[in-house]
Amino acid sequence: MKVILIKDSNAGKKNQIVEVSAGYATNFLFRQNLAIPYNKDNEKFLKDVLEKEREIENEKRFEANELKTKLEKINLSFKLKASLRKDGIISVHSSISAKNILNELEEKHGLKIDRHALENVHINTIGLSKIIINLYKDIKAILLVKVEKDE
């Protein structure tokens, strides 16, 4: 018996058409609302659902690409307290966290980003650092952060 899965189950993934035994379909999949019978009406319903999901996917991907272009034009700069040690090495006394970067992006540029999207965030060196921001699935932006010594 052919069925269209509504949710992920042992038979397969959501929106997949699978062949299962009649007993498994009627006694388990239909009763648990995991599948619907395969027929022309339900096939049309499945095509509509897949088309809507594709549209939503394309819209999210487009928004992520727009945000990526905005982020890659931005250069953030911070000042950290630092001192020169006797051996000539600069010793930094504080660091820049994800919270600092997100606050700066929101206040100065009006961009709100989830804090879990940031990678390699803990910055405690003077100079230029790259922050990777995961925007959507395989779309990533690189944000440049310049850290200067505060006098």
From Swiss-Prot:
A GO term for molecular function: structural constituent of ribosome
Gene Ontology CC annotation, any one: ribonucleoprotein complex
Signal peptide: none
UniProt entry keywords in alphabetical sequence: Ribonucleoprotein, Ribosomal protein, RNA-binding, rRNA-binding
InterPro entries: Ribosomal_bL9 (IPR000244), Ribosomal_bL9/RNase_H1_N (IPR009027), Ribosomal_bL9_bac/chp (IPR020594), Ribosomal_bL9_C (IPR020069), Ribosomal_bL9_C_sf (IPR036791), Ribosomal_bL9_N (IPR020070), Ribosomal_bL9_N_sf (IPR036935)
PROSITE patterns hit by this protein: RIBOSOMAL_L9
Short name of one Pfam family: Ribosomal_L9_C
Biological process, per Gene Ontology: translation
Similarity section: Belongs to the bacterial ribosomal protein bL9 family.
Function: Binds to the 23S rRNA.
Protein name per Swiss-Prot or TrEMBL: Large ribosomal subunit protein bL9
UniProt organism field: Mycoplasma mobile (strain ATCC 43663 / 163K / NCTC 11711) (Mesomycoplasma mobile)
